[in-house]
């Protein structure tokens, strides 16, 4: 089920992307980080996603009079897994070349947890918090937000 294009949401996406990019750019003036609120961009993405998913569900309920959990989750998988697999396959050769063997073991585990949409738990319980200084050695650390989003949709589609 295709939702109508909403150009105003692109403006919100732009704000979200820029806040995350500026945060990760670590731009400083006289030693002071000028943008400390990158997390706001992630929050904006969560809100946009919740809004769009709710719109899709309501539209399906209005048109068909019912809602299929199976179809909902099939659409989520078809939308997310191909891009996630592409990123993983693209990253593998670089990780093989640049990561130390001990780091590569954690990298391999992070792939499995990312595919299971539970990387937020993996990174948290393995002491690899998002925002940690060694984040550059964790190519899939960013998948914590995807995991949180998908866990939310398991509980509250």
Question: What residue ranges belong to the model's regions?
Answer:
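Membrane-interface helix/loop caps of multi-pass membrane proteins
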Residues: 1-157
């Amino acid at each position: 089920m295709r939702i109508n294009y909403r150009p105003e949401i692109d403006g919100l996406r732009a704000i979200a992307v820029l806040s995350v990019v500026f945060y990760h750019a670590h731009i400083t003036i006289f030693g002071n980080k000028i943008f400390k609120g990158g997390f706001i961009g992630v929050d904006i993405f969560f809100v946009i996603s919740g809004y769009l998913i709710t719109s899709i569900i309501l539209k399906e309920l209005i048109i068909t009079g019912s809602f299929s959990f199976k179809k909902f989750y099939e659409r989520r998988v078809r939308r997310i897994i191909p891009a996630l697999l592409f990123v993983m396959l693209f990253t593998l050769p670089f990780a093989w070349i640049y990561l130390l063997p001990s780091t590569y073991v954690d990298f391999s585990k992070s792939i499995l947890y990312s595919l299971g949409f539970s990387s937020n738990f993996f990174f948290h319980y393995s002491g690899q918090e998002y925002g940690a200084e060694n984040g550059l050695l964790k190519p899939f650390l960013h998948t914590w937000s995807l995991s949180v989003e998908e866990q939310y949709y398991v509980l509250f589609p």
